[in-house]
Amino acid sequence: MTQSIQRAVWSFWSKPFQVDRKSFWFSEKHHLLSWVLSFERARQHYPETVLITDDDGVRMLVDGLGLEFETVSTELNALQSHDPEWWVSGKLYAYREQNKPFVHLDSDVFLWKMLPERVISAPVFAQNPEYFTFGDENAWYRPEIFRETIESRQGWLPEELSWYISENRNQAMCCGIFGGNNLEFIHHYADTAIQIIEHPKNKTSFAFLTCKSVDSFLVEQYFLAACIFYHQAQAISVYSNVNIECLFSTFEDAFTQAKQVGFTHLLGGAKQNPQLADKLERRVAKDYPDRYQRCLNYLDQVARAA
């Protein structure tokens, strides 16, 4: 029997952000304001709030912004020496650490309403399915290249991923939100995804991947679909009855139905849109004036220390 989810989880591995990913935002101020809005909106619906981060993340989000997470873990200190191009490691470690049903939110996701019961009661859930074309060099997902790069150098891939690619499956799952009630399956998925990144046999192969930061989406989102559909196809698998529910049925619905559902995700270029940045700033200044001022004070403090 499933439980009603009370736990909202965020993760922040500071190393990839410091190296590259901060450039994804209109400004550092708007990145921080997004954290404020994501946290404050979600905790109205999911009161047990958890942050999985490292020491630098604590200094920024807890000491700096004053976000009042119920639980803070510095589990991601374990990634200090890891390759920051595999930015998704922070999320995968956070998924693996959970010991009760949860929803993990990216910090650019804002929940204006509770997630529907059909979603939060599911064994596993994600934001929406994504599809791509095999052989498209501009696609976010290039599983045939990923497999060839690893297998040609005697690397290691889990059975789920090898099978899914061999079947030419072209479905992934967007993980702007991710979570569920079947923790055994989620732990298996997250731990196996981490093994793909950390397996000693893959170290040589990864030197030949041209964009590991993009392949991170494959390891998280394509492999999630691979895990679901592989085990559904194996009658003897303990996970054969695990299904996944998506908040939106299609990528397009995530835009056209977002207001109705009460969900905002600042995907991709939206983070650098000046009009959206202005709306974000005005919303936080209006709804959370103390947090807004705390953000400005923190930015001043960082600037003075530079």
Label every model-predicted segment.
Residues 48-55, 101-106, 126:
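Short, hydrophobic beta-strand segments that form beta-sheet elements in well-ordered domains
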Residues 53-59, 107-113, 242-244:
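Short, polar loop motifs at secondary-structure junctions
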Residues 111-232:
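Glycogenin-like
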